[in-house]
Amino acid sequence: TVVHPHMPDFLALYPEVDVQMRLEDRYMDLIDDPVDLAIRITNHPPPGLMGRHLMDIDHLLCASPQYLARHGTPVHPLELKAHSCIYLGEEPGDAHWKLRSHGKTVTVAVRGRYAANHTGVRLDAVLQHIGIASLPRFTAREALADGRIVQVLPDWSFLPNYSGQLWILHPPTRHLPLKLRVLMDFLAERLGGVDGLQVQRG
């Protein structure tokens, strides 16, 4: 996850604060469920909740240098048809990749022998030279920086079916506990959020 890599530092900075993290695919009801904070990807935070914008989520296509050396580097989206593409695999539309460049959008029906709905699994598949994957930039950042993977079609913007902004949300309250405020501030600083940005919907 995008949050977990930063938690050891948070726990070291605030030894008096305990954290229980729950990874759920289902929608968490912050009013009825016993949850203090939720982190969601959305462009529209739900009405009635308060939240803080942490970061924008963008995606890119990546492959290992070894895979590209063996199979060639695509220079146009349509060339992805000839490659092993690692996609989300939850819905039929996940195998149709959309890319945009200079106002032109191209949709490509891709295929591959491996699909995974977890970004960490797709990254590992790329590192194992299985193919070209769509990855959030925050997932790919470290491997890109050290050269283990490279961006494919860098002149094209990948348009995922699921995108948005990363928000940390909590139920409306006049007095947010200090331990929650420090966690929100910490994550906003680490993930590039705008300091002090608080919104209330509804």
Predicted stretch roles:
Residues 84-103:
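Secondary-structure junction motif
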Residues 1-50, 200:
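Central regulatory/effector-binding core of bacterial HTH transcription factors
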Residues 19-23, 108-118:
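Short beta-strand-to-loop elements that line the ligand-binding cleft
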Residues 46-51, 143-154:
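Ligand-binding "clamshell"
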Residues 48-59, 63-88:
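Flexible hinge/capping segments at coil-to-helix
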Residues 25, 41-43, 64-65, 135-138, ...:
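Beta->alpha turn/N-cap motifs
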Residues 141-142, 146, 155-202:
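C-terminal effector-binding regulatory domain of bacterial HTH transcription factors
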